[in-house]
Amino acid sequence: MRKPETPARETIAPSDLTFGLSTCKRCLWLKYWFKFELKKEFPLVKPLADAQEEHFRRAPMQAIHPSLKPGIVKQWGQWVKSAPITINGFETRWKILGIYDLLGHYEDGTVGIIDCKVSDSDRDNGAFYAPQLEAYAYSLENPDRGKPFPVSSMGLLIWKLAGVTETRQSELASNSHGFGVNQNYVPVERDTDQFMSLLEELITTIEGGMPKSGAECNVCNYLIARAELDID
């Protein structure tokens, strides 16, 4: 396979620092050079996530969790783009481009990133999602244009479905039952050195030749098994 002279995209998606690197570097490489990736459909994820995010718009930060500093959620669902990423003193062609869920503005002038999750996955922990949140923080503190925002907190706001529960009728719901949730806020500690190391790994992977498939990549394993059937 001949590698194109220029990649199909020059911005890094924050989620590729979690799911991309940890799943399959070959699929990651194909995405950036050929814009070739498997499209996944999750019909319920977006409406559930939108409902969660809308609920906390303009909310006090301490309504999300008492440990957070005084402040208000003032921004949500906005794209952020970083300046070109510098690795080992060399400015690369790559920038981070992503969209955060909620951004709280603290009274001390700093901001807090809140990533919303409606899930029951064992991966809903700070360590797994830290690179993705760090990518948003990097873009806010090193923007492609405009003023930087210092980030003083990052965290996951997790809703886990807890079955059907009684609710009140309202302009949004016509019956008296709905899905209940248990809410949990998970603070995510910043680790800039680890984040820059992951960025270097990702950029090195993309800029190199096509890597091997990930051993547990469902897409690659399916394609290999399908080819081995030798069906016309």
Where are these regions (language model features)?
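Metal-dependent nuclease catalytic cores that hydrolyze phosphodiester bonds in DNA/RNA
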Residues: 1-110
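Short beta-strand-loop-alpha-helix junction that forms the active-site gateway
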Residues: 116-126
